[in-house]
């Protein structure tokens, strides 16, 4: 059991026997009313999204999900097939099931993912917090524009755009924080 004030992104709740993922949680306390938690939830079985408000002391059922290591095996249209690294079982997910990690998924990636299961059914995939990706296009840095932290847009192999430091060049590998889509530095790859 969790209370409303303990909710945070990544928490999974059981509401009407379905697992709901907390995607965003914002704690609000006003002088007149009691504290509340505004949340954005996603149903892991249907993909339906909603916004809900909970009181700080509301009791909520949390769910413990099973997790297994997996790798991306192949992509076929909007279908993504992952393979369990221990018993080589194949699992398939649609693009809408993994919309949060979609910008980082690309054919041939070697990252170990976490396959997330609810009652034996694969419902989502989570990536490591730091991944390495190759920059395929970026502009040259503007000369003399060096006061402070200077960033510029860069395009990755799968088409995702990210803000990188001005010294990053085309074909370099960079580390990305998947929690907030931020540039961490050059990769050691």
Curated annotation (Swiss-Prot):
One term of GO molecular function: translation elongation factor activity
Keyword Protein biosynthesis: yes
Subcellular location(s) per record: Cytoplasm
Protein's UniProt keywords contain Cytoplasm: yes
Biological processes per GO annotation: peptide biosynthetic process
GO cellular component terms, A-Z: cytoplasm
Record SUPFAM superfamilies: Nucleic acid-binding proteins, Translation proteins SH3-like domain
Pathway(s) this gene product operates in, as recorded in its UniProt entry: Protein biosynthesis; polypeptide chain elongation
UniProt KW keywords: Cytoplasm, Elongation factor, Protein biosynthesis
One Pfam family from the record: EFP_N
InterPro entries with a match to the protein in the record: Elong-fact-P_C, NA-bd_OB-fold, Rib_uL2_dom2, Transl_elong_fac_P/YeiP, Transl_elong_KOW-like, Transl_elong_P/YeiP_cen, Transl_elongation_fac_P, Translation_prot_SH3-like_sf
Main location group: cytoplasm
Family, similarity comment: Belongs to the elongation factor P family.
Function: Involved in peptide bond synthesis. Stimulates efficient translation and peptide-bond synthesis on native or reconstituted 70S ribosomes in vitro. Probably functions indirectly by altering the affinity of the ribosome for aminoacyl-tRNA, thus increasing their reactivity as acceptors for peptidyl transferase.
Protein name: Elongation factor P
Annotated source species: Pseudomonas putida (strain GB-1)
Lineage per the UniProt record: Bacteria, Pseudomonadati, Pseudomonadota, Gammaproteobacteria, Pseudomonadales
Gene name linked to the record: efp
